[in-house]
Amino acid sequence: MKVRPSVKPMCEHCKVIKRHGRVMVICPANPKHKQRQG
């Protein structure tokens, strides 16, 4: 899980979602692409 000021999809499988008021990227194909804003 990377914590970044700006989260962007890194591949076509990445999905931008919002959980508990935080913007997150989840990626089923490449778990390295997981990101959280903060």
Swiss-Prot record:
Gene Ontology annotations for the cellular component aspect, listed alphabetically: cytoplasm; ribonucleoprotein complex; ribosome
Pfam families: Ribosomal_L36
GO MF, one example: structural constituent of ribosome
Keyword Ribonucleoprotein: yes
One Gene Ontology biological process: translation
Signal peptide feature range: none
Source organism, top-level taxon: Bacteria
Assigned keywords, A-Z: Ribonucleoprotein, Ribosomal protein
Keyword presence, Ribosomal protein: yes
HAMAP family for the chain: Ribosomal_bL36
Protein family per UniProt: Belongs to the bacterial ribosomal protein bL36 family.
Annotated NCBIfam families: rpmJ_bact
Name the UniProt record assigns to this protein: Large ribosomal subunit protein bL36
Species the sequence originates in: Lactobacillus delbrueckii subsp. bulgaricus (strain ATCC 11842 / DSM 20081 / BCRC 10696 / JCM 1002 / NBRC 13953 / NCIMB 11778 / NCTC 12712 / WDCM 00102 / Lb 14)
